[in-house]
């Protein structure tokens, strides 16, 4: 922690307009900066304050955006703060979320919701109380346009896939030996800190939560776990597989997701923040017509509320007869534009998450990603950790509410 002292109160931006939601950020790191960048470009949301345990970090980020800076325990004293965005290391998420909810503040929490299921349950119960503020978790894949397109194709034609498999060959260049990522007491471990993204996405596309999880882990000689393999069995025999390895330079990174619908379709998403989708569909005349109708307007097909298209998005269809009347092989390609880079797409997905929370606050409805979603993906991740430790398949905990 920096030795920089806190001023009595570091005053930055003026009061937001009456109808704007003032946003206070806890966590002045890289992800916190992404949240501020996304929030300041969202009409009706106004960043007002930055909090961090390190005064120097808080003041530096606050100064960059013209905001107030304060210690975390004083953020809720600011009457301008209506929404608390939490971007600290994971071990602080549950405590900060509970404090914000109990203080009547809405919460936008970076994943995971907690590192322990007991703490996640406390948050779940607080969020379920009558009149409770709204809470959502930053599951950016749910707000990615290619996942939105897949969801629409499933509803119109394909139904849930039979299998979901994610492969993450990731860089460790920014994860030095002392980084909190490697400390399971702080990060929760790979499946909790990072894997919940994909456990949630897999359950969302498969339309069910896993019934059984099995997993393996590999550690370096110094004890740091850098590789995790997990498999999940879903109701009806659907399967999901998750592989994470944080063990290579950035130039060798590679991530992809494979989807399979058995005899009817198969597909692949490229990038952990997906940039491209390829989908092969075997269909008949009505199925072809459904895909063509869905993709005629690509902006509608890829639409995510709060996500601003760049103009580089494209959807193309290639068609071939299967040699039988009315039977077709269809290849769909969709791209968000590789030149855009995953940074912009990630930031727009965060913006869409904030927009969804904003809409839920205005309507009184629940956001698209709820505390229950965050709880169940954490339960699956913890089941994977237990399975790796015991060598036995584990049933995830059941949602208590």
State each model region's role.
Residues 1-17, 83-85, 307, 316, ...:
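C-terminal helix-rich "cap/oligomerization" subdomain common to oxidoreductases
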Residues 1-65:
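N-terminal Rossmann-like dinucleotide-binding module
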Residues 35, 67-126:
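Beta-loop-alpha module in the N-terminal Rossmann-like domain of NAD(P)-dependent dehydrogenases
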Residues 104, 131-132, 237, 391:
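Glycine-centered short loops/turns at secondary-structure junctions
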Residues 109, 115, 135-137, 242, ...:
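Hydrophobic residues in well-ordered beta-strands that form the structural core
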Residues 114-175:
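A contiguous active-site-proximal alpha/beta segment in oxidoreductase catalytic domains
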Residues 177-253, 271-273, 372-375:
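Rossmann-like dinucleotide-binding domain that binds NAD(P)(H)
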Residues 220-223, 240-352:
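NAD(P)-dinucleotide binding in Rossmann-like oxidoreductases
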